[in-house]
Amino acid sequence: MKPGIHPEYKKVIVRCACGNEFESGSVKDELRVEICSECHPFFTGRQKFVSAAGRVDKFNKKYGLK
């Protein structure tokens, strides 16, 4: 690596839209994110599963398959 051409990597505070803050590393001074592990549905357990069973039943009914 050439000296003096790389940006300085430093610790920064990452702020989420939900109000959560955590520390990470970046070359930027400040990071803002819309969603984090504290408010994302996958991590909070509020995830909704979309069931395709209704569409499959409709297809089978339409084409006479079992």
Swiss-Prot record:
GO cellular component: ribonucleoprotein complex; ribosome
Cystines in this chain: none
Keyword rRNA-binding among UniProt keywords: yes
Pfam families: Ribosomal_L31 (PF01197)
Cofactor remark: Binds 1 zinc ion per subunit.
Xref: SUPFAM superfamilies: L28p-like
GO biological process, one term: translation
Entry keyword Ribosomal protein: yes
Molecular function terms, GO-annotated: metal ion binding; rRNA binding; structural constituent of ribosome
UniProt cross-references to InterPro entries, sorted A to Z: Ribosomal_bL28/bL31-like_sf, Ribosomal_bL31, Ribosomal_bL31_A, Ribosomal_bL31_sf
Binding locations of Zn(2+): 16, 18, 36, 39
Keywords in alphabetical order: Metal-binding, Ribonucleoprotein, Ribosomal protein, RNA-binding, rRNA-binding, Zinc
Gene3D superfamilies documented for this protein: Ribosomal protein L31 (4.10.830.30)
Cofactor(s), by name: Zn(2+)
Domain of life: Bacteria
Homology family: Belongs to the bacterial ribosomal protein bL31 family. Type A subfamily.
Function: Binds the 23S rRNA.
Summary of subunit composition and partner proteins: Part of the 50S ribosomal subunit.
Xref: HAMAP family: Ribosomal_bL31_1
Annotated protein name in UniProt: Large ribosomal subunit protein bL31
Gene for this chain: rpmE
